[in-house]
Amino acid sequence: MKKLKVGMIGGGGGFFGKVHHRAISLDATREVVAGALHQDPALCAKYADEWGIVGYPDYKAMIADWQAGKLELDYVTIVTPNFLHAEQALACLDAGLPVMCEKPLCYTLKEALELKDMAKKRKKAPFALSHTYTGHPMMMLARELIKQGKIGDIRKVETYYNQGWLATLLEKTGQQQAAWRTNPKMSGISGCGGDIGTHALINALWTTGLGIKKVSARLTALPGRALDDDFNVLGELSNGATMVLTATQIAIGNKNNTGFRINGSKGTIEWMQERAEELQFFDGNTRTTYFQNIPVPEMPAVLQSYGRIPCGHHEDFLEALANLHTSLERKIRVLKGEKNVPPSYDHPGIDEGVLGMKFLVAAVGSSKKKGAWMKV
């Protein structure tokens, strides 16, 4: 089997570019071969050299070389701040290149809808959205159990994502990750909501298969911060069930504490990212644990350089992200006409991306009106 060739836009010097690179390389079926890794040409060349790939000063030059037959690419991964996603993804899709894009999908809902229209026109260029947690086998199992009716009719969904890294005005110190995430010109209309609230939303809706009708929200921020760092939403789901979503970046002591509890008429399913290899299924008075792992404590400083993932995640975080790349890879191989390709799982794509943007618009609008109900 020939390896798929992957290009990357952004990600140079950033922690998540490295995570994508490792996830792509985890299987022997894909490899990163080129990238426009940074807006600074000198740094772009530096990071490309570190990875041993062809470096480009900008993504347009990389696409042009692919179109001219000077570069072999099968898809592109976009790992840039939110405000750049639409322009870059549109350029790739317009050229016929499949895309794996970081979330949230875009800077504005208008951009998201334009991107969806383009994705529909380019049926031979699949589009994937990297909601990494949906790649965890236990979350995929939860989705299958719900589809099989194991918990009955869904009555209530609690979904959350707790972090503590923005409990102070870290962006004022020049910390790069904090600076762009709290800047409306780069992140969009919501900070915490766009960064991790969309994870909590898609984790819940993708797993249950439900939509969302309307929301009542309260968003707050530390004095001196331009965007929300605490994001709380009450929602009505498409079947009439209640969703309670909380996302915060000011919960001191939390790294990446995300998960959900889904209550049905016949049972309950619960999953926590910090115990990602464990899925709790409650059926009446019995509890089934599908897989149990031993939580890993914080590593001492001498061992931290051996970690390959963001703090607060388990090592299987790489495998979860790799699973999303595998789903996209399989779609591409089928479109190429390859035989005996295993079926691709239905991981998030353009529709979930648009839903996430509609959700943010409704939540921000509701919060501005003191929690008034807003349609999604």
Regions from the language model: what does each represent?
Residues I53-M118:
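Beta-loop-alpha module in the N-terminal Rossmann-like domain of NAD(P)-dependent dehydrogenases
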Residues A34, Y75, K156:
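Short, Asp-centered acidic motifs that coordinate Mg2+ and/or phosphate
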Residues L237, K266-H347:
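C-terminal glycine/acidic-rich active-site capping loop/insertion
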Residues M1-W51:
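N-terminal Rossmann-like dinucleotide-binding module
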